[in-house]
Amino acid sequence: MSEDRQGRSGDSNKILYCSFCGKSQHEVRKLIAGPSVFICDECVELCNDIIREELEEKAQSARSSLPKPREILEVLDQYVIGQLRAKRTLAVAVYNHYKRIESRSKNDDVELAKSNILLVGPTGSGKTLLAETLARLLNVPFTIADATTLTEAGYVGEDVENIIQKLLQKCDYDVEKAQQGIVYIDEIDKISRKSENPSITRDVSGEGVQQALLKLIEGTVASVPPQGGRKHPQQEFLQVDTKNILFICGGAFAGLDKVIQQRSNDAGGIGFGVKVKSSERKQEVGKILAEVEPEDLIKFGLIPEFVGRLPVVATLEELDEPALIKILTEPKNAITKQFKKLFDMEGVELEFRADALSAIAKKALKRKTGARGLRTIVESVLLDTMYELPSQENVSKVVVDESVIEHKSEPYLIYQAQPAPAKAASGD
């Protein structure tokens, strides 16, 4: 019966029917044949509508789940102390980036350009932590690459495509997830070219790497070896489109402040006023870096094309003593909170006195390691205590004061009061 109803495509006498809605070939405009089935143009249109609605729902869901700039800033504040201007710049840039991805799914006339980010700031000012916190908040794959290990293709070292392979590893080789991830390239200032003039000889770890990164950052389809890499050469390469991957580049850019000052002084002309202006401009490095222009980055050694691919520039200030003390105590994952938890697991309370926190901050400033050096200092002063404590009994509290930091004294151990032994009852 059903065979008579559907007919056969080779039998011109049989009337053909849509396998989905049951309409005959005479009731619809077009009937498309498949292996033993037929579908009419009306059912095709209905399927398109269903898919379109599902995609719209998906887009709306993504839009509602994307945190707004103010919400992004609130989360960054929980983990990163200070750097308000940089955090605001990042919050807006990231929000606009993921809105841009959403707009690409629609057929809009206006195509939004990609806005990768350059973070400029001293060592230990929070560049890497900002990028990590953003990725965690947005729940997207995140990887960190070291620019100093990269070389041009064909030379000893890592190819730039290795960055995308690391990103794929973070999301278990899910290409779709990786294509919306975040890549942080650290030490980007270390690949500046050696002189302002284009190099005659090959600069495989400087200008050459910048050239290799251009397409990757702007948006290209990168061919990446699948899981297992060279062990399975017969496998096809994975094609990863980088146009929706957000690239954040960071570096200390030591000496950039002098380039900025020189430009400002040159702009002031010549004469007696220049000397006065120069002395007035003895400011903090962070404030000088905030005035950075693309021409300063080019003079520093980044090629113009590379600077053009990083339109959003956020500068971070050098952390002072009060900021370092806050970093020690205030963030959700503050260093002192982490060590207090470790000691608490031994049933011991850990106390850092105010003078100890100040001494730790001063030592980090002296070493010029910023926030990154705080953990090293705390770890070193508590090492012996953490070694001995599990074997000791009745310790209730460990106190760290200034003398422990400055003079390498042992932390104070406070023991639980032992109950007095019970007196033997005297016989009558």
Curated annotation (Swiss-Prot):
The keyword Heme does not apply. ATP binds at P122, T123, G124, S125, G126, K127, T128, L129. GO terms for biological process: cell division; proteolysis involved in protein catabolic process. One of its GO terms (molecular function) is ATP hydrolysis activity. Residues 6-59 form the ClpX-type ZB domain. One of its GO terms (cellular component) is HslUV protease complex. The keyword Nucleotide-binding applies. InterPro entries: AAA+_ATPase, ATP-dep_Clp_protease_ClpX, ATPase_AAA_core, Clp_ATPase_C, Clp_protease_ATP-bd_su_ClpX, ClpX_bact, P-loop_NTPase, Znf_CppX_C4. Disulfide bonds: none annotated. It comes from the Bacteria. Zn(2+) binds at C18, C21, C40, C43. PROSITE patterns: CLPX_ZB. Keywords: ATP-binding, Chaperone, Metal-binding, Nucleotide-binding, Zinc. Transmembrane segments: none annotated. ATP-dependent specificity component of the Clp protease. It directs the protease to specific substrates. Can perform chaperone functions in the absence of ClpP. Component of the ClpX-ClpP complex. Forms a hexameric ring that, in the presence of ATP, binds to fourteen ClpP subunits assembled into a disk-like structure with a central cavity, resembling the structure of eukaryotic proteasomes. NCBIfam families: clpX (TIGR00382), PRK05342.1 (NF003745). Belongs to the ClpX chaperone family. This is ATP-dependent Clp protease ATP-binding subunit ClpX. It comes from Xanthomonas oryzae pv. oryzae (strain PXO99A). The lineage of its organism: Bacteria, Pseudomonadati, Pseudomonadota, Gammaproteobacteria, Lysobacterales. The gene is clpX.
